[in-house]
């Protein structure tokens, strides 16, 4: 088990802060409209709390103590990141906060759903099973997997705002009887031992201070014989932390995506085994070079892969030109006190992260979809 000493936080105090920050915006349609309905002072405090971990911390000056500080404060870092980034994610990407592979001629929406189906298939989720979604976002993947499998899914999320939005979307789609969303920390899950038939995590456990720690908690709440599947964000074996440019890419990904620290593939494999899982399968789904669209194409201004108007709009919102328009628009809205102060700084941080993701993807330094499937032993 990891020896990292984690800093505790006051859940009641955080809940009160989040309610002031978001107000009724969790009940809005999301995206830009929700962004305009934040409390200005609380938003500024969230911006300061998040960016203190990255401001004036350059790749060439990075020392282990800086990364350790982020790791110790992972809960605060992650919660404030999603307090700031959720509305921008919904505006620019979708309600499924993850990447995916693309088949020939496949639209963005279909590819996102297929990526979720593929994980559910690998885990063997069936109708009536009790399933846990670790780090569920606003519930996009959970809703899709419920519709695909007929299982009951419980979503766990440290961010109260996202939990509230996930519940609203589930009710809107008539899925409240199949979905439940719980606010909590995946390093100390609020569930009894042996609670779930299957567990999955889609690009979420990267926020953990210790992969072994979060995988161990997943094993604890999984029933004996149950299957856990994860799409993990990992640096590849090519990544060299002593290479300053590669380190900058990694640090920009961490800044733009609310990550305390990234690990390499061998670390992820060691962690899932050390947590007590029998590793059934592992594969870097981003490594397949079959001539189809790369996973990062929506961030890379490459219109040739767009299949419909919705894809074109996604590309425009996420590419450099769209981000430049958003940068200037938010600046005007902040100056007019329509958008809360710090919104542009947040958007610029996400943009820096997006550029690093593309660069890391092209250079094969990083994967957002390292698939690991593990089984909890029948007898423990």
UniProtKB/Swiss-Prot annotation:
GO-annotated cellular components: endoplasmic reticulum
Enzyme class: transferase
Reactions this protein catalyses: lanosterol + S-adenosyl-L-methionine = eburicol + S-adenosyl-L-homocysteine + H(+)
Induction, per UniProt: Expression is positively regulated by the FgSR transcription factor that targets gene promoters containing 2 conserved CGAA repeat sequences.
Enzyme Commission number, as recorded: 2.1.1.-
GO biological-process terms attached to the record: ergosterol biosynthetic process; methylation
GO molecular function list: sterol 24-C-methyltransferase activity
Assigned keywords, A-Z: Lipid biosynthesis, Lipid metabolism, Methyltransferase, S-adenosyl-L-methionine, Steroid biosynthesis, Steroid metabolism, Sterol biosynthesis, Sterol metabolism, Transferase
Pathway stated in the Swiss-Prot or TrEMBL entry: Steroid metabolism; ergosterol biosynthesis
Keyword Magnesium carried by entry: no
Superkingdom of this protein's organism: Eukaryota
Family of this protein: Belongs to the class I-like SAM-binding methyltransferase superfamily. Erg6/SMT family.
UniProt cross-references to PANTHER family, sorted A to Z: HYPOTHETICAL LOC100005854, ZGC:194242
UniProt function note: Sterol 24-C-methyltransferase; part of the third module of ergosterol biosynthesis pathway that includes the late steps of the pathway. The third module or late pathway involves the ergosterol synthesis itself through consecutive reactions that mainly occur in the endoplasmic reticulum (ER) membrane. Firstly, the squalene synthase ERG9 catalyzes the condensation of 2 farnesyl pyrophosphate moieties to form squalene, which is the precursor of all steroids.
Other remarks on this protein: In Fusarium, the biosynthesis pathway of the sterol precursors leading to the prevalent sterol ergosterol differs from yeast. The ringsystem of lanosterol in S.cerevisiae is firstly demethylised in three enzymatic steps leading to the intermediate zymosterol and secondly a methyl group is added to zymosterol by the sterol 24-C-methyltransferase to form fecosterol. In Fusarium, lanosterol is firstly transmethylated by the sterol 24-C-methyltransferase leading to the intermediate eburicol and secondly demethylated in three steps to form fecosterol.
Protein name: Sterol 24-C-methyltransferase ERG6B
Taxonomic lineage of the native organism: Eukaryota, Fungi, Dikarya, Ascomycota, Pezizomycotina
């Amino acid at each position: 088990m990891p020896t990292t000493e984690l800093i505790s936080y006051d859940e009641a105090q955080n809940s009160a802060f989040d309610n002031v920050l978001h107000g009724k915006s969790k009940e809005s349609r999301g995206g830009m409209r929700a962004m305009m309905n934040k409390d200005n002072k609380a938003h500024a405090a969230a911006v300061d709390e998040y960016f203190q971990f990255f401001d004036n911390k350059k790749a060439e000056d990075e020392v282990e103590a800086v990364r350790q500080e982020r790791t110790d404060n992972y809960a605060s870092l992650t919660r404030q990141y999603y307090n700031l980034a959720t509305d921008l994610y919904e505006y620019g990407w979708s309600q499924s906060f993850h990447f995916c592979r693309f088949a020939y001629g496949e639209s963005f929406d279909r590819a996102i759903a297929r990526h979720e189906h593929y994980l559910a298939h690998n885990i063997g989720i069936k109708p009536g099973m009790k399933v846990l979604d670790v780090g569920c976002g606003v519930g996009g993947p959970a809703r899709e997997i419920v519709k695909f499998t007929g299982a009951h899914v419980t979503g766990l999320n440290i961010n109260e705002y996202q939990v509230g939005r996930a519940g609203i979307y589930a009710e809107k789609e008539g899925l409240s009887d199949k979905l439940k969303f719980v606010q909590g920390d995946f390093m100390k899950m609020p569930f009894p031992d042996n609670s779930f038939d299957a567990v999955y995590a889609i690009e979420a456990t990267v926020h953990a201070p210790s992969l072994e720690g979060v995988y161990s908690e997943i094993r604890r709440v999984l029933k004996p014989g149950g299957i856990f599947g994860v799409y993990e964000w990992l640096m590849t074996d090519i990544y060299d932390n002593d290479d300053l440019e590669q380190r900058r890419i990694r640090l920009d990904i961490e800044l733009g995506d609310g990550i305390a620290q990234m690990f390499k593939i061998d670390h992820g494999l060691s962690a899932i085994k050390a947590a007590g899982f029998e590793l059934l399968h592992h594969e870097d789904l981003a490594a397949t070079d079959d001539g189809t669209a790369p996973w990062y194409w929506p961030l890379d201004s490459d219109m040739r892969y767009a299949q419909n108007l919705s894809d074109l709009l996604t590309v425009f919102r996420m590419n450099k030109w769209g981000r430049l328009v958003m940068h200037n628009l938010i600046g005007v809205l902040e100056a007019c006190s329509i958008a809360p102060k710090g919104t542009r700084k947040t958007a610029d941080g996400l943009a820096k992260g997006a550029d690093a993701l593309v660069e890391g993807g092209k250079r094969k330094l990083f994967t957002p979809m390292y698939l690991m499937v593990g089984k909890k032993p029948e007898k423990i």
